Amino acid sequence: MKDILVVAKLKEGKFETFMGFMKSEEGMNERRKIADLTKTLGTVSPDKSAVMFKIAVHDEDAMYSFLDGSNPVSKPIFDEVMESYEIFELNKI
């Protein structure tokens, strides 16, 4: 597994829609394909315009598909809510 940090900027007023999907059964099933959810840490900016997740990824291709719009489950919601995202690989020191 690889530790990855994802920072996403959300379209204005779309935080609740984003989190609704991420917590839904459909969203959780897709996220399980990517990472160990028991090791996921998340936070949100005070104005709810950005989210950050540290995830323990076991399928990087699925992660990229989930984020870039090529996953048919996440695409409709991410087209609606996502402004941009950045992915960082984390290394323990």
Language-model region placement:
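Short, exposed beta-strand-loop hairpins at the edges of beta-sheets
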Residues: 77-79
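Short S/T/G/P-rich N-terminal loop/turn motif that feeds into the first structured element of a domain
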Residues: 1-73, 83-93
